Curated annotation (Swiss-Prot):
The keyword Glycoprotein does not apply. Pfam families: Ribosomal_L31. One of its GO terms (cellular component) is ribonucleoprotein complex. This is Large ribosomal subunit protein bL31B. Belongs to the bacterial ribosomal protein bL31 family. Type B subfamily. It comes from Staphylococcus haemolyticus (strain JCSC1435). It comes from the Bacteria. Part of the 50S ribosomal subunit. Keywords: Ribonucleoprotein, Ribosomal protein. PANTHER family: 50S RIBOSOMAL PROTEIN L31, CHLOROPLASTIC (PTHR33280), LARGE RIBOSOMAL SUBUNIT PROTEIN BL31C (PTHR33280:SF1). The lineage of its organism: Bacteria, Bacillati, Bacillota, Bacilli, Bacillales.
Amino acid sequence: MRQGIHPDYHKVIFLDTTTNFKFLSGSTKTSSETMEWEDGNEYPVIRLDVSSDSHPFYTGRQKFAAADGRVERFNKKFGLKSNNN
């Protein structure tokens, strides 16, 4: 690798501010705020609005829209019967 062209890659703590869920990962982002991790070391903290701990898709609280709405509308418009009936 060429020297001096790659960003500094280091461990950081990502903190979901909604649920206070924390995880340690590698990143090129940095922060002046630090926090002590479970291993006793201090790492920079990156605050997140949404993570896998609070996103509706991953938590199972997602609401699904009716997927067959367009098909039903087309069939109704052209007087076709639905296959479901």
